[in-house]
Amino acid sequence: MAKKKANKQLIYVVMAALFAAIITVVTASVLHIPTGNGYIHLGDSFIFLAASLLPLPYAIAAAAVGAGLADALTAPIWVIATVIIKSLIVLPFTSKKDKIINARNLIALIPALIVTCVGYYLADRILFGAWDAFAAVIPNVIQVAANAAIYVIFGLALDAAGFKKKVLK
């Protein structure tokens, strides 16, 4: 029994590390579109997947490390805000269901959108004191919406393949 638990924890650690690496690369370089106050990327879709597959501490680590490293490479001033915001957006998701795409995880996309928009708005105000920080809300909405769509597509594909049952059970 202890060996099975240790194996499961090892799988979670390895998957969290893989997700952190994927999040870093996809955020920093794959379809990296600059905006006035930041950039649009597809890394959040993998944060949503990590949050739907891994227990909470592992999902938080994958999101914080992956997104934090991406910002350290591309926009270092945002690292602290990003680590906090990305850690928070995983909280409403669950990995306890049999499927990645379930009602709770679909609803979790709404608080993820709110936390992203409000979090980066506040960070922009704190960092730059700019009243134009509200202009960054629209690119953040576009980013979260695009990432949500990719998350659903990937999640449905992984569910159809029985990924959770084969790898995590």
Please report, for each region that a protein language model flagged, where it lies by residue.
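Loop-helix junctions at membrane interfaces
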Residues: 1-169
